[in-house]
Amino acid sequence: MATLNPRDVVIVDGVRSAMGKSKNGMFRNVRADSLSAELVRALIARNQFDVNEVEDLIWGCVNQTLEQGMNIGRNIGLLAGLPKTVAGQTVNRLCGSSMQAIHTAAAQIATNQGDIFIIGGVEHMGHVGMMHGIDLNPEASKHYAKASNMMGLTAEMLGRMNGITREEQDTFGVESHRRAWAATQEGRFKNEIIGVEGHDANGFKILCDIDEVIRPDANLEAFKALKPVFDPKGGSVTAATSSALSDGASAMLLMSAERAQALGLKPRAVIRSMAVAGCDAAIMGYGPVPATQKALKRAGLSIADIQTVELNEAFAAQGLSVLKGLGLYDKQDIVNLNGGAIALGHPLGCSGARITTTLLNVMEQQDTQIGLATMCIGLGQGIATVIERV
């Protein structure tokens, strides 16, 4: 177990909503800010501390318009009933937004600019489309190809560069669903999912506490029958080996080690290191490799020291390419043990804190000590966080 210093950044708790389908899904009548506020209230209820001590609520969100606009972070805090003296901000690093929220809060704690932070992220992709209101500068084409904005084509590029076959991708996708459904049936998500009121297909109110995107019947034959969607003539990436459009939120409670101790709260993990890195936009999915390498170096670790990994699965071709790049291709038995975004979906701003929360729970379930959460980011970035149980 890790020995803590007073200003070490500890994770006290982490929760998430179930993941809903973006098209006519269970959260179709639930707003992004309301969904997030439910998690903040649950996080507070699960942990005894004075909410007046919260320095800031930091929320990741990508498409900050419509119901996700006007600093959704501040709105979430007010909706959740936090004192008006608690500040709120919204951060955007595209797919890595809520992991960036972790990093932002951690940096403030480490430099003595606050002791308690609530962080999280949300994306309601059913209400706010991925490209809603986007107006990219035509001059940007000098620096990256327009096709680099099409995430599926970047996955095709990575797959070809790293020799990832269609069969490998299909197998990876089916396994993601199998693991996620097994985790659901065995109750491995119960400690992280907070049930939120939504609606079933008939419009009746239900408590949504099971991920809606998982396909229990996923099988190799069905996956093999699908045609490539991004490069119809020579491609290998299909809808089944891409992360689903989904709606969801996540939240975490971070503190300084000394404040958690003073409050009698037992930390679940300490943040060992953090990193971000850039790469070519055409292979944006490779970003976790340089980001992880930086984070490992800062922690004085090697990839061999990592016992549990949560890697965002934007696409099977992307995930497998990253595993090859990190030397984890033959260690998939320690990666995404409860399934990944191919099965659970990838609500952009939600995903960073979601995979970190899932990582924490898997580490406890597997009784491992050191874990890595990492993800790719559109336009060529990666982000990584190394945590250790305490």
UniProtKB/Swiss-Prot annotation:
Biological process terms in GO annotation: fatty acid beta-oxidation; phenylacetate catabolic process
Enzyme class: transferase
Active site: C95 (acyl-thioester intermediate), H346 (proton acceptor), C376 (proton acceptor)
GO cellular component: cytoplasm
Keyword field contains Lipid metabolism: yes
Biochemical pathway: Lipid metabolism; fatty acid beta-oxidation
Location within or outside the cell: Cytoplasm
InterPro entries listed in its UniProt record: FadA (IPR012805), Thiolase (IPR002155), Thiolase-like (IPR016039), Thiolase-like_sf_Thiolase (IPR050215), Thiolase_acyl_enz_int_AS (IPR020615), Thiolase_AS (IPR020610), Thiolase_C (IPR020617), Thiolase_CS (IPR020613)
Catalytic activity reported: an acyl-CoA + acetyl-CoA = a 3-oxoacyl-CoA + CoA
Main location class: cytoplasm
Highest taxon of the lineage: Bacteria
The enzyme's E.C. designation: 2.3.1.16
UniProt keyword list: Acyltransferase, Cytoplasm, Fatty acid metabolism, Lipid degradation, Lipid metabolism, Transferase
Claim: Acyltransferase is one of the keywords in the record: yes
PROSITE patterns per UniProt: THIOLASE_1, THIOLASE_2, THIOLASE_3
One Pfam family from the record: Thiolase_C
Molecular function terms, GO-annotated: acetyl-CoA C-acyltransferase activity
Function recorded in the entry: Catalyzes the final step of fatty acid oxidation in which acetyl-CoA is released and the CoA ester of a fatty acid two carbons shorter is formed.
Family from the record: Belongs to the thiolase-like superfamily. Thiolase family.
Subunit structure: Heterotetramer of two alpha chains (FadB) and two beta chains (FadA).
Name by which UniProt lists this protein: 3-ketoacyl-CoA thiolase
Organism name: Acinetobacter baumannii (strain ATCC 17978 / DSM 105126 / CIP 53.77 / LMG 1025 / NCDC KC755 / 5377)
